[in-house]
Amino acid sequence: MNSATSETTTNTGAAETTTSTGAAETKTVVTSSISRFNHAETQTASATDVIGHSSSVVSVSETGNTKSLITSGLSTMSQQPRSTPASSIIGSSTASLEISTYVGIANGLLTNNGISVFISTVLLAIVW
């Protein structure tokens, strides 16, 4: 509910009026003076402050909450012969995916970490 209220204050030579109508507030200052040529002068300054309300609130999920999936593993696909039973295809592809995941994790560790490269080089030298 918007109700209009008005407040008037008179200071020495200046009349100040403030009007509030809920979401807007207007302040008017009128200053009267006499110039050096004995002319009456009036100066009016007015300022309006408007308070705006918005009902379009954006939820947190719409403000750019982005998740990305980064996979450093290798993706391998193998083509099975037509005579292969379905049960062995599932097992084979699962094992292949599992191995490629481990290889991808190891590859990511080796490329991102200089210490891992050094350790793997030492281990390869010991094995050979």
Swiss-Prot record:
The organism's place on the tree of life at top rank: Eukaryota
A GO CC annotation given for this chain: membrane
Keyword Transport included in the entry's annotation: no
UniProt keywords, alphabetically: Membrane, Transmembrane, Transmembrane helix
Keyword Transmembrane helix: yes
Region (Disordered) location: 1-26
Membrane topology of the entry: Single-pass membrane protein
Induction (free text): By FLO1.
Transmembrane segments: 105-127
Compartments where located: Membrane
Family statement: Belongs to the flocculin family.
Protein name: Uncharacterized protein YAL065C
Higher taxonomy: Eukaryota, Fungi, Dikarya, Ascomycota, Saccharomycotina
